[in-house]
Amino acid sequence: HKHLSPTHPDLLTVIVPRHPHRGAEIAEMLRSDGADVAVRSNSEPVTPQTMVYLADTMGELGLFFRLAPIVFMGKSLVPAGGQNPIEPARLGAAVISGPHAWNFSEITDAMVAHGGLEIVADGNALAAAIAADLADPGRTQARAHAALSYAEHESKVLETFIDRISPHLDAAERKRDAGA
């Protein structure tokens, strides 16, 4: 946010911690760094001065993925394994990840190949990627569309698999029931 706000003064960064109970700790860390923070669990409103909206509540991640045109997947700039990029892809966001998303390497590799995910090396590269997205909405929309297309394709693969094995499962169940 610090790198981008001079050229994008209306920018609002939304942080959704994986562990909402860390909300107060994260808010304090951000405030000590000079950020104006609104905390969702405290019902603090977003004002024109708000720099960061800390969505430290449960069950609303999809809402923020749908609202955000650009989503950065946490735990991926540090060696922590990353997070699954499929959910923001399904909800129409342009997805960015760091290089340490090994927990989801097959998905991230495939999404990169489809143009639906951008990998950045570090915080400076993340700021540059977001700046490029903000400067070129067509770039952002193209990556979001590619991410959604990939996610929909993967959903169809699962549906096809289920359609193909269901008759066999049904036959096995009938056979088991007949022998019982």
Name every feature range the model reports, one short phrase each.
Residues H1-A180:
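Nucleotide-activated sugar donor-binding and catalytic core shared by glycosyltransferases
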